[in-house]
Amino acid sequence: LTTVQTDGSMGYYSIMVARKDSGMTKVTDIKGKKLGFADPDSTSGYLIPTVTLPDALGGKPVKDYVASTGFGGGHENLVLEVLKGTFDAGTTFGSGVGNFKDGYTSGNLRKMVDKGILNMSDLVELWKSPLIPNGPLVIRSNISDATKAKITAFFKALPTKDAACFSAIEGGEYKGYADVNVNFYKPIIDARKATIGG
């Protein structure tokens, strides 16, 4: 299973942000700047930007375009480090659904807004990746088919049976869950293989 956004999409985006007062307004403005990534193990905070940003930068590898790169220690910390000026810009994630000024409908920016630790008017969006498949909700393969069916039915019913619980689990506004298989994640698998070999 995977989550379905309020608009019916089943993905999210890597989003590059900078301070509103930085003067930067587009991704090419990061030339010669300090770029922060969320975490080396993050799909949206590192993997996808590393693989897809060169297209937006005229074919240049990120490391050859910016002055330096570093890691923020997670998505929330990365955004805080951008606000502090440790990085001129940084990559995090959001649903891309709704308005940037609200932190979108879900994702790190929305969670930070909901916690009261981020005012979106302090940031500007410089870049948004291609759609990234939402993460999976998986069941071990050696569990009986009957148990798998019960677990699947429970999660598919959760948005209507206990909307507050569903929202707390997923961290934002989602429509529900949908069935997917490993082929849905092929772009991520291929991107990971391209960066580590295999």
What is the meaning of each model-derived region?
Residues G8, V27-D29, W127-L131:
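Short, flexible turn/loop "capping" segments at secondary-structure junctions
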Residues A18-D39:
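Flexible hinge/capping segments at coil-to-helix
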Residues L1-M24:
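Short, glycine-/small- and polar/acidic-enriched structural segments
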Residues N108, I139-G198:
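An extracytoplasmic/periplasmic, membrane-proximal ligand-sensing/linker region
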Residues K34-S144:
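Pocket-lining segment of extracytoplasmic ligand-binding domains
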Residues Y13, V27, T50, E76-V79, ...:
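Extracytoplasmic/secreted envelope proteins and their assembly/folding machinery
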